[in-house]
Structures are given as structure tokens and as C-alpha cells.
């Protein structure tokens, strides 16, 4: 039996927390059509992702991919930083 090739799930979002060591919290926003009224509404999900080098800061736009569970709530890993947050 040949092994089926798995597609790697990747998502893009904003870093909302970097207070943990080697972990970031990423906010994923998506637009969903309301089933009755038809209006598009924003829905969001917060995911914990592994950041090995502690390179992300709050406000960065990042790309993450699904991986094996690394902790109780962490099963995503940082792929790359797409856009750095503006320093104030």
C-alpha cells in the first residue's frame, strides 16, 4: 500500500502575543457568510505556534504550518515572518 502524500496546512495571521518562551499566539481572521442573512462577518481564531528563535514581535504578519503536537495547546510552527510590525 503506497503512502498518500499529505498536504501541509499553512495559515497567515498577526502575532498578538510573544510573552512565552519560543511560543507565539497568532490571530487568524476569516470572513464567513451568515447562513440566514447572507452578510459576511469576521470570525477569528487564536493559535499557539512554535517560534524556535524567538524572532517574532507583536504585530508581525507571519505564516505558520501545522505540525505534530509540541505541547498541550501548541501544534503549529512558524514558517516565516512576512511583514515586520512598525516600530513606534
From Swiss-Prot:
Gene3D superfamilies: Nucleic acid-binding proteins
One Pfam family named in its UniProt record: Ribosomal_S17
GO cellular component, one term: cytosolic small ribosomal subunit
UniProt keyword Protein transport, yes or no: no
Annotated CDD domains: Ribosomal_uS17
Signal peptide from the UniProt entry: none
Keywords linked to the UniProt accession: Ribonucleoprotein, Ribosomal protein, RNA-binding, rRNA-binding
Gene Ontology molecular-function annotations: rRNA binding; structural constituent of ribosome
NCBIfam families xref list: PRK05610.1 (NF004123), uS17_bact (TIGR03635)
Function noted in UniProt: One of the primary rRNA binding proteins, it binds specifically to the 5'-end of 16S ribosomal RNA.
Quaternary structure, from the entry: Part of the 30S ribosomal subunit.
Similarity section: Belongs to the universal ribosomal protein uS17 family.
Protein name per the record: Small ribosomal subunit protein uS17
Native organism: Pseudomonas putida (strain ATCC 47054 / DSM 6125 / CFBP 8728 / NCIMB 11950 / KT2440)
Primary gene name: rpsQ
Amino acid at each position: 500500500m503506497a503512502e498518500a502524500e499529505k498536504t501541509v496546512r499553512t495559515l497567515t495571521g498577526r502575532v498578538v502575543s510573544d510573552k512565552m518562551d519560543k511560543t507565539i499566539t497568532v490571530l487568524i481572521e476569516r470572513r464567513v457568510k451568515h447562513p440566514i442573512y447572507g452578510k459576511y462577518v469576521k470570525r477569528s481564531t487564536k493559535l499557539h505556534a512554535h517560534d524556535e528563535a524567538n524572532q517574532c514581535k507583536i504585530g508581525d504578519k507571519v505564516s505558520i504550518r501545522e505540525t505534530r503536537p509540541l505541547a498541550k495547546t501548541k501544534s503549529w510552527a512558524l514558517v516565516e515572518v512576512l511583514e515586520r510590525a512598525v516600530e513606534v
